[in-house]
Structure formats: structure tokens, C-alpha cells
Amino acid sequence: MSAEVPEAASAEEQKEMEDKVTSPEKAEEAKLKARYPHLGQKPGGSDFLRKRLQKGQKYFDSGDYNMAKAKMKNKQLPAAAPDKTEVTGDHIPTPQDLPQRKPSLVASKLAG
């Protein structure tokens, strides 16, 4: 057992030496982390931004807001009952079917 402990220690030392030798990038990274500790944090923005994002859906412009508002109204209002028996579109009007226009009381300035 005493022989295993030095081997484990030497293996750890070898890993540390390899890390130091093979990765100067890690050394530079450690220097930068020491100099700028706040840059290592996860991105998330300010507290204000996080709070605004947690609030929920926000609208891009007034059109989006009005469309969402109209959808909510359509869901809340029940469908209108067909009380009227009037049918639209069963007769196509012709010029003879239309009533005559009444002449205007005010003379047109274009007529002269």
C-alpha cells in the first residue's frame, strides 16, 4: 500500500506538470480570471433585465398588443345567436332594381 501512495502522488504531479507545459492558454485564462472576476459569471444581464424577462409576454408594438387583445375578446364573448332570419346575398341587384337618385339641393360648383 505504501508503494501505491507515491505512484498516485507522482501521477497527480505529472498531470499538473502536463497542464502547465501543454496549455499556456490556461495560464493566461487564470490571469484574466484573476484580473476580471466578474467576466466569468454566466451571462444573464442585469437584475432589471431578468425581472422584465420573467414577467411574461411583452408586445413588439401596438399592433401586436391590439391583436392579442382582440383574441382575448373573441374567447370571452359567446358566439352571437342567429336571431335574424334575413338572408344576405340571395338577390343580385340590377340598375332597374335600384331606386333613382334624388337631385342635390346644393348646386355643384363643377357644373358651372
Curated annotation (Swiss-Prot):
<keyword id="KW-0597">Phosphoprotein</keyword>
<dbReference type="GO" id="GO:0005737">
    <property type="term" value="C:cytoplasm"/>
</dbReference>
<feature type="modified residue" description="N6-acetyllysine">
    <location>
        <position position="109"/>
    </location>
</feature>
<keyword id="KW-0963">Cytoplasm</keyword>
<dbReference type="GO" id="GO:0046579">
    <property type="term" value="P:positive regulation of Ras protein signal transduction"/>
</dbReference>
<dbReference type="GO" id="GO:0000086">
    <property type="term" value="P:G2/M transition of mitotic cell cycle"/>
</dbReference>
<dbReference type="GO" id="GO:0015459">
    <property type="term" value="F:potassium channel regulator activity"/>
</dbReference>
<feature type="modified residue" description="N-acetylserine">
    <location>
        <position position="2"/>
    </location>
</feature>
<dbReference type="GO" id="GO:0005102">
    <property type="term" value="F:signaling receptor binding"/>
</dbReference>
<dbReference type="GO" id="GO:0000278">
    <property type="term" value="P:mitotic cell cycle"/>
</dbReference>
<feature type="region of interest" description="Disordered">
    <location>
        <begin position="74"/>
        <end position="112"/>
    </location>
</feature>
<dbReference type="GO" id="GO:0051721">
    <property type="term" value="F:protein phosphatase 2A binding"/>
</dbReference>
<keyword id="KW-0007">Acetylation</keyword>
<dbReference type="GO" id="GO:0019212">
    <property type="term" value="F:phosphatase inhibitor activity"/>
</dbReference>
<feature type="modified residue" description="Phosphoserine; by GWL">
    <location>
        <position position="62"/>
    </location>
</feature>
<feature type="modified residue" description="Phosphoserine">
    <location>
        <position position="2"/>
    </location>
</feature>
<dbReference type="GO" id="GO:0030425">
    <property type="term" value="C:dendrite"/>
</dbReference>
<protein>
    <recommendedName>
        <fullName>cAMP-regulated phosphoprotein 19</fullName>
    </recommendedName>
</protein>
<keyword id="KW-0650">Protein phosphatase inhibitor</keyword>
<dbReference type="InterPro" id="IPR006760">
    <property type="entry name" value="Endosulphine"/>
</dbReference>
<feature type="modified residue" description="Phosphoserine; by GWL">
    <location>
        <position position="104"/>
    </location>
</feature>
<comment type="similarity">
    <text>Belongs to the endosulfine family.</text>
</comment>
<dbReference type="Pfam" id="PF04667">
    <property type="entry name" value="Endosulfine"/>
</dbReference>
<dbReference type="GO" id="GO:0051301">
    <property type="term" value="P:cell division"/>
</dbReference>
<comment type="function">
    <text>Protein phosphatase inhibitor that specifically inhibits protein phosphatase 2A (PP2A) during mitosis. Inhibition of PP2A is enhanced when ARPP19 is phosphorylated. When phosphorylated at Ser-62 during mitosis, specifically interacts with PPP2R2D (PR55-delta) and inhibits its activity, leading to inactivation of PP2A, an essential condition to keep cyclin-B1-CDK1 activity high during M phase. May indirectly enhance GAP43 expression by binding to the NGF-regulatory region of its mRNA.</text>
</comment>
<keyword id="KW-0131">Cell cycle</keyword>
<dbReference type="GO" id="GO:0005829">
    <property type="term" value="C:cytosol"/>
</dbReference>
<feature type="compositionally biased region" description="Low complexity">
    <location>
        <begin position="1"/>
        <end position="11"/>
    </location>
</feature>
<keyword id="KW-0132">Cell division</keyword>
<dbReference type="GO" id="GO:0045202">
    <property type="term" value="C:synapse"/>
</dbReference>
<keyword id="KW-0498">Mitosis</keyword>
<comment type="subunit">
    <text>Interacts (when phosphorylated at Ser-62) with PPP2R2D. Interacts with SNCA. Interacts with PPP2R2A; the interaction is direct and this interaction inhibits PP2A activity.</text>
</comment>
<feature type="modified residue" description="Phosphoserine; by PKA">
    <location>
        <position position="104"/>
    </location>
</feature>
<dbReference type="GO" id="GO:0019888">
    <property type="term" value="F:protein phosphatase regulator activity"/>
</dbReference>
<feature type="region of interest" description="Disordered">
    <location>
        <begin position="1"/>
        <end position="49"/>
    </location>
</feature>
<dbReference type="GO" id="GO:0045722">
    <property type="term" value="P:positive regulation of gluconeogenesis"/>
</dbReference>
<feature type="modified residue" description="Phosphoserine">
    <location>
        <position position="23"/>
    </location>
</feature>
<dbReference type="GO" id="GO:0004864">
    <property type="term" value="F:protein phosphatase inhibitor activity"/>
</dbReference>
<feature type="compositionally biased region" description="Basic and acidic residues">
    <location>
        <begin position="12"/>
        <end position="32"/>
    </location>
</feature>
